[in-house]
Design a protein with these regions (language model features):
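Alpha-helical cap/lid subdomain in secreted, periplasmic
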Residues: 246-247, 254-255, 497-549
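Extracellular/periplasmic envelope-modification machinery, especially enzymes
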Residues: 350-503, 507-510, 521, 549
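Glycine-rich, phosphate-binding/catalytic loops in enzymes
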Residues: 40, 478-481, 529-532
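Short, structured coil segments at secondary-structure junctions
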Residues: 106, 478-479, 536
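Structural recognition of the beta-strand scaffold that forms the well-ordered cores
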Residues: 42, 67, 111, 461-462, ...
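Short, hydrophobic/glycine-enriched beta-strand segments
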Residues: 11, 17, 460-464
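Hydrophobic membrane-embedded alpha-helices
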Residues: 6-10, 16-386, 396-400
Length: 549
């Protein structure tokens, strides 16, 4: 297949994307819309895959499909497999509780259908009260892999039938609209959004926007020189597009209905505009994104994506409480992510190595020496046998863990899920008739009768996360007129719509107790906004409980 030329400023855009994704998981209160950055990768994938297929078809009248797939999947497979071996070996040695159900996670990821498997078993991208798997982020690679396989075949069929690349543009636009519509229709407000977040059908619009742009504005056209006045306009438009994206990344929450009913589609359209503007050399933003730090990160964006989630999930499961000196914990995780990603980059991008137990590896290679150089900061001879021996040892440990891994539901997690589900159902029932509720006032052990009577008649609103849900029964037993508003993984900055709804239902009482902070920290500005939305006339109390996640 014809090799598509690399766009240096778009590498810089990849850097911005992976930075946003990582900080969404490390500091979600700082960048609550960072999850939207995956759309950048989807759009760039659609852009370059479409450009490559059209270019080869126009030059040769056909597509070397087998060669195309081999090249694409070779770049994905070996770094992916190496990451999974290292992480599984680590889990086997140090965090054996995460071996539960590990086999289907690995098989679905290597088989490139992880996103649909997660949907089928009800895995949630947004639940944070326990670590489900260090491989949860691999849904992303499965979606991209499915696009790699299917879209070129669709394009070949269209080109063979209509002999005009504009049919690809029309098809891409139509499919993007259908996909966005499917996301909006399948999303159920108030329920977990993982189905529409993971689905290839509901994320297709981002790829299609990239594909449409590739037909309308191929990179060759974007390289054409323009007058300085046009360049200034491009810069102004680029700054405006990045400003809009900045607002989206800082304000579009994963819990909002708007996000899935048009918001994510609009975000992808805006990213598409930013891609075209960024790629043009006359745009000043293009010059900024050519800086070496952006290029360094952008060229390693795939390895950074592979490693960030295992590091974050395993570190936070091990440390448990990162609220004490959070800056230090963030720095440690960033260093680990960068180091592991750089090792992978040196081995698989610079050295083009294959893991030493695949079909292309030969025993004689073990005793050869290869020169390793690059941004690790040294040059010299790297003994292949050390690499091979270490890889085989890690593989054996990982295989041992896989053999020992059990299937089934974590008993503690299952009990907590059932308790929370029951509490949510009861919470809705409680809130429907909170003001008219009447029940016998029983004595409560440890509380004086006077206190029991006062608590029973107190008008209190409780707002919180799964911690609140887990104790809602006990709260209502004591506070007979309470309104309880809880949700799994809720964070303080996600409460704007909740407060507005409580006000609309006239259930925001003069006393408000807040159970938030277990799922992450928040900024002073977010706290001030929260207090303002509640109202300064209210009596406001905060309770935060640190629990193992």
């Amino acid at each position: 297949m014809t090799v598509q030329k690399r766009s240096v400023p778009l590498d810089g855009m990849r850097a911005l994307a992976i930075i946003a994704i990582i900080f969404y998981h490390l500091m979600p209160h700082v960048l609550p819309g960072g999850y939207l950055a995956v759309n950048i990768f989807f759009i760039l994938t659609g852009f370059f895959v479409t450009a490559s297929v059209i270019k080869e078809y126009s030059e040769k009248g056909k597509l070397a499909y087998k060669s195309y797939l081999s090249r694409r999947f070779h770049k994905l497979f070996f770094p992916l497999l190496s990451m999974m071996i290292v992480v599984t070996a680590y889990i086997t040695l140090f965090q054996r509780g995460l071996l539960l159900n590990l086999r289907p996670w690995i098989l679905s990821s290597l088989g490139m259908f992880n996103n649909w498997w997660q949907i089928s078993v009800g895995a949630s991208y947004f639940e944070q009260f326990y670590v489900q798997s260090p491989f949860m982020h691999l849904w992303f690679l499965s979606v991209i892999s499915q696009f790699y396989i299917i879209w070129p075949l669709v394009m070949l069929l269209l080109l063979a039938l209509y002999k005009d690349k504009r049919i690809i543009l029309y098809t891409a636009v139509l499919l993007s609209l259908f996909s966005a519509l499917a996301m909006g229709m399948l999303y159920v407000p108030g329920e977990d959004a993982s189905r529409v977040y993971y689905g290839t059908d509901t994320r297709l619009f981002s790829f299609m926007i990239g594909s449409a742009l590739s037909v309308v504005w191929p990179l060759e056209r974007l390289d054409e020189p323009v007058p300085k006045q046009i360049g200034r306009r491009l810069t102004l438009a680029g700054l405006l597009s990045y400003a809009v994206l900045g607002v989206m990344f800082s304000s579009m929450l994963d819990s909002q209905a708007f996000t899935y009913r048009g918001g994510m589609f609009l975000n992808s359209v805006m990213i598409g505009i930013a891609v075209v503007l960024t790629a043009h050399p006359a745009n000043f933003i293009s010059k900024i994104l050519r800086f070496k730090p952006f290029q360094w990160i952008g060229r390693r964006s795939f390895l950074l994506y592979l490693w960030y989630y295992p590091v974050v999930s395993l570190y936070q499961a091990k440390v448990v409480d990162t609220s004490v000196d959070p800056g230090r914990h963030v720095l440690i995780q960033l260093v680990l992510i960068l180091c592991l990603s750089e090792i992978g980059y040196q081995l698989f991008e610079k050295e083009r190595r294959k893991i030493p137990f695949g079909p292309s590896w030969r025993l004689g290679d073990t005793f050869s020496k290869r020169k390793l150089s690059g941004s690790l900061g040294f040059t010299g001879h790297f003994p292949e046998k050390i690499f091979a021996t270490g890889s085989v040892c890690l593989l054996l440990i990982a295989l041992t863990g896989l053999v020992q891994a059990k299937s089934g539901e974590n008993a503690d997690v299952q009990e907590l899920r059932e308790q929370i589900a029951a509490s949510q159902s009861k919470m809705e029932e409680i809130n429907r008739d909170a003001s008219a509720r009447s029940r016998a006032i029983n004595n409560i052990e440890g509380l004086e009768r006077e206190v029991v009577l006062f608590a029973h008649d107190a008008d209190i609103t409780f707002i919180g996360d799964s911690v609140l849900l887990s104790v809602s029964d006990q709260l209502v037993t004591i506070f007979g007129r309470a309104v309880v508003e809880g949700a799994v993984s809720r964070q303080l900055y996600q409460t704007t719509e909740v407060i507005a709804d409580l006000k609309k239902r006239e259930q925001l009482h003069d006393t408000v107790v807040v159970f938030l902070g277990s799922n992450g920290t928040f900024t002073r500005t977010q706290m001030e906004r929260f207090i303002k939305e509640i109202g300064t006339s209210k009596d406001l109390f905060f309770l935060t409980t640190n629990v193992p996640r």
